[in-house]
A protein has these predicted regions:
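Generic surface-pattern signal
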Residues: 31, 80, 87, 119, ...
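Surface-exposed binding/hinge segments that line
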Residues: 4, 40-116, 145
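Extracytoplasmic/periplasmic ligand-capture domains
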Residues: 2-38, 49-53, 67, 127-132, ...
Length: 261
């Protein structure tokens, strides 16, 4: 799968986004030393390697592990990071994709320098300090109070501000994301109009709110389809020691099924 990056996309320091940034970001996602166990398989099961084009810094080819209809969309989920900022010494340049996928990575590939690099890269501060949250979007994180709120502000010199596409248009100067952890507080905030938008409302709460005239006057609300599904998995082959064998009884499985709306 060969891609061509749109021209004119720039990092906050004015340097252009290149295919090397993409290659670096993929290596970060695939490397076993990165603290991303939960999502690494999203990429390692799809991406085999990245090939750059020396004569075109915006072009690259992704070789997939196997043929699949969704392979070409993998980069829509990739967190692209600035190589010059995170790897100025080009440490990952010395690590091939074959090395990253090697079963002997920990024994044969990892060096003290590489280990030190990832110990620094994986520090918690890199995930929360606004000055280190570098991106290509229209907004910059300016304040993050853990468990309370996140503030993002519009970049004045953003590369896409003259693009008329609706996807590249940013309106508010500042957006505050309030972290509300329970549905009762969300409902109360909507009733008191202390928030402008929420997607964290359960079905019953929204249906109750839609019965209120003041809510309908101040908010536009509705139910939308999601590209997702929910399921209940039953372990029908437990070991009988740590997991009891009660799901082997079809009547138990049937009873559980009756509890699902």
């Amino acid at each position: 799968y060969t891609y061509k990056i749109k021209e004119g996309i720039k990092w906050d320091d004015g340097t252009p986004l290149t295919a090397e940034d993409v290659e670096y970001s993929v290596k970060i996602m695939l490397c076993p030393l990165t603290n991303n166990t939960q999502i690494r398989s999203n990429y390692s099961t799809v991406i085999k390697s990245i090939e750059l084009f020396p004569n075109d810094p915006l072009k690259f080819t992704m070789y997939a592990q196997k043929l699949h209809v969704d392979n070409k969309y993998i980069f829509s989920e990739l967190y692209i990071q600035q190589k010059d900022y995170w790897d100025p010494e080009r440490i990952l340049d010395k690590i091939s994709f074959e090395n990253l996928m090697s079963k002997d990575f920990d024994k044969k590939i990892v060096t003290e320098k590489l280990s030190d690099y990832f110990n620094e890269f994986n520090k918690d501060d890199n995930s929360y300090q606004p000055e280190k949250l570098l991106g290509l979007g229209a907004y910059q994180v300016t304040e993050w109070e853990k468990g309370q709120y996140i503030i993002i502000e519009r970049k004045e010199d953003w590369w896409g501000k003259f693009d008329l596409s609706i996807y590249n248009t940013s309106f508010p100067d500042k957006i505050i994301f309030k972290i509300i952890t329970d549905k009762v507080s969300v409902e109360l905030a909507l009733k008191n109009q202390t928030i402008d938008v929420s997607t964290a409302i359960d079905t019953k709460t929204l249906m109750d709110l839609q019965k209120r005239e003041d809510f309908n006057q101040n908010y536009t609300s509705g139910f939308i389809d999601r590209y997702a599904y929910s399921y209940l998995g039953m372990n029908t082959k437990p070991d009988g020691i740590e997991r009891k064998k009660f799901f082997v009884d079809k009547n138990v499985r049937r009873a559980i099924a009756y509890t699902i709306p």
